[in-house]
Swiss-Prot record:
Entry keyword set: Cytoplasm, Nucleus, tRNA processing
Name of the molecule in the record: Cytoplasmic tRNA 2-thiolation protein 2
A GO CC term assigned to this protein in UniProt: nucleus
Similarity field: Belongs to the CTU2/NCS2 family.
Amino acid sequence: MQNTALDNSADSKCSKCDNKATVLTKSDAVCDSCFVRRIENKIRRQFELVRPNLQGRKSKRAMLAISGGISSMAMLETANYLSKYRDDNYRPMFDELLAVHFQWGTDSAVAKTIEESISKNYPKCPFKVIGEAELLNRTIATDSRGNIEINADNEKFNPEVISSLASRQDLLYRIRDKLLVSYARKANCDTIVFGDSGTTIAARVLELVAEGRGFAIPWYTSVCSKLPNCDTFLLRPLREVLSSDLKSYMNIKGLAFCDSLIEARPNTIHGVTESYFSSLNDTFPSLVSTVVKMSSKLHVPSTEAICTICNLPMQEDAETWLQKTTVEHPDSVEGIKNQNVCYGCSVSLKSLKGTLHIPDIEKEGI
């Protein structure tokens, strides 16, 4: 639903309630109240779709992955509405919420914005900031052939040894998600809620295919999924809403978010694919929803294989796939020796300039 603000001089009426229309959507013109209600109904409808999967048809404790951007802050608003924190909620979906923000580097401006917004609008929701130093002290080592060394506790995480910017950023995204699942287990959360909009999910479909991780698309784009050998549900209730709609929604409601997160996208596969879909919203407004609906038709394959590096489900025998898709076939001696490394990570490891030390998530004790 691509939208634009109507000129104040326009004399059009809302198609729903006959009040003055303020937002022009793909199909009609609506007022602020009806636009907000439409967005919230879309998100709540997705939440209701996953309710039957939860024990007792609700989550005892849900962890909200908050980056501070538009989508995650909009997700926080809706999750709080559906929680037990509202006294008038007769059918809550969440008994408890825990908002978590991972802070990379020393800049705490985003964390401060999130904390102020939560204190003002959601005072009952606990909020935790996990710093980089707290997470990345213990590592395991891997070389370009996927060999793992588990006794590397004295080394720091060193993504700079990956020469490719795209591979480096990809690794950071995968480690972040791995940390989220690990922390959810330790915090006794049975659910993780992500604020991925439809625009983000459509971009992620292309991103995963380009990285050679197409096998993992159902886990990364479904409204509700569970990783193999993991009891935590992964929810993405904003998958039917465009990022442009969420920006209008947040502005109308006067809710804070960090706009800098949108402007400062790195020049990586993720940034390129998301910019691609955002730029096509005006010309092809149905493109994002088409890609999202297509991804929802992909069924979760039956597998127990997990990549030791990115922790995503993987198709086994990554070395065979690498040999088939490489123009100049490398010698078997130089190939990936660890069969527990997925195809996407095996490609990234090829660009290593030295030994890579990856956070040993299970040892961190976060």
